Regions:
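Asp-box/WD-like beta-propeller blade repeats and closely related beta-sheet repeat scaffolds
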Residues: 56-57, 66, 71-73, 83-125, ...
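Residue-level marker for isolated small/hydroxyl-bearing positions within beta-strands
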Residues: 27, 35, 80-82, 88, ...
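Surface loop/turn motifs at the tips and blade-to-blade linkers of beta-strand repeat domains
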Residues: 13-18, 58-64, 104-113, 162-166, ...
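Short coil/turn segments that connect the beta-strands within blades of beta-propeller domains
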Residues: 29-30, 74-75, 126-128, 180, ...
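Blade-loop segments of beta-propeller domains
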Residues: 42-75
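Beta-propeller domain segments
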Residues: 1-7, 118, 136-139, 148, ...
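Beta-strand-rich domains and repeat architectures in extracellular enzymes and scaffolds
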Residues: 3, 10-38, 247-254, 270-271
């Protein structure tokens, strides 16, 4: 079994037999970092002979508490887990961290650890700050910050503050490479049927509020909560792109520098891990979100599919062999996709002329 890609692309297995393939980051020198939360570790993979498949594998760091977010900056690898952000010294060519990791965020910086557990990190283009996406503890309810927020920190881990709020479960988080705008993709609330509430992609602004738990898609009131904070209902931002409800968007990756057509270089890709409770299963694919002049056009289309064993659209529990979660561009511009369930990394490359 393998993902299905358009005819002008090819797919090959980059790595398999992993413990828990979730999140990816790639160094400029080509080393691939993989967060494996259930194993509490970060794995380093290298394709030393350039054949498109990892032939070297080592444990970069271990003993972490559900590590998920990964970022590289200077001579350090940043890892976000349930306890905070850890910084590890590293140099290209090294197969392990050069020393013990240091937790640079203060205790309790992410709130309690229950509920949505992914903590993903993006470093600002100027290298002065990093941002962490922190999901809610429950499906819907009033929860104290920093749950359901994106927090900003100085690059040394100090100065943490809420940057944007009302985000039920923000997972993928990334800066647009040209505009510098910070975007996230959000898993919205359950319990309102198959058609509500759409998951979404949104540009984040400092101090902005995005609805949860009082409203959704702008000032549409959430029953049982809207009357508690009518001021926040009115402040709720409308997302830039709405995804099919319960698609479970995970990684957000911009295409610039990848093996894609010139008119795709401004676009984004989003990994849909797929629904778990929808009557008609949805997701289980990678989609392309077109941009124009640095802004999303508001629609999306399939790019990588084939993770389902049954026919899409049927009212049945989905049978899947893989759920796409993490994405990164390899040094050669190919697209790497980490899929849990089968715990493999797939490589998508463009065919030559």
């Amino acid at each position: 079994m393998a993902p299905i890609v358009p005819p002008e692309y090819r797919v090959n297995l980059f790595a398999d037999n992993l413990d828990h393939a979730r999140w990816l980051a790639v160094a400029e020198t080509g080393e691939v970092f993989l967060a494996e939360p259930r194993a509490g570790k970060v794995t380093l993979l290298v394709d030393s002979d350039g054949d498109g498949r990892a032939d070297r594998r080592s444990t970069f760091a271990s003993g972490l508490d559900s590590p998920h977010g990964l970022a590289l900056h200077g001579n350090h690898v940043y890892v976000a887990d349930l306890e905070g952000v850890w910084r590890y010294p590293w140099r290209p060519g090294q197969r392990q961290a050069l020393g013990e990791g240091t937790r640079i965020t203060p205790p309790g910086a992410f709130g309690d650890s229950g509920g949505h557990w992914t903590r993903n990190i993006a470093i600002a283009p100027d290298g002065k700050r990093f941002y962490v996406a922190i999901g809610s503890a429950g499906n819907i309810g009033e929860e104290p910050a920093p749950r359901a927020t994106v927090k900003a920190f100085d690059i040394d881990g100090s100065g943490g503050r809420v940057f944007a709020s009302g985000l039920r479960n923000p997972v993928g988080i990334a800066f647009h490479p040209d505009t510098g705008t910070l975007y996230t993709v959000v898993n919205e609330r359950d319990g309102l049927g198959d058609g509500l509430v759409p998951d979404y992609m949104a540009a984040l602004e400092d101090g902005a509020f995005y609805g949860w738990p009082y409203a959704y898609i702008g000032p549409n009131p959430q029953p049982g909560y809207a009357d508690r904070r009518p001021d926040l209902v009115q402040r709720t931002r409308v997302p830039d792109v709405l995804f099919e409800s319960h698609s479970a968007p995970m990684a957000l990756l911009f295409a610039k520098g990848g093996q894609f057509p010139a008119d795709w270089q401004d676009d984004a890709f989003v990994a849909f891990r797929g629904s778990w409770n929808a009557a008609v299963p949805t997701g289980y694919k990678i989609v392309r979100v077109p941009f124009e002049n640095g802004k999303p056009l508001g629609w999306y289309e399939n790019f990588v599919t084939g993770f389902r064993l049954d026919e899409p659209g049927r009212r049945t529990t989905a049978r899947v062999w893989g759920r796409p979660v993490g994405m990164a561009l390899a040094k050669d511009g190919s697209l790497l996709i980490a899929a849990d369930v089968d715990h493999s990394i797939w490589r998508i490359s463009r065919r030559g002329p």
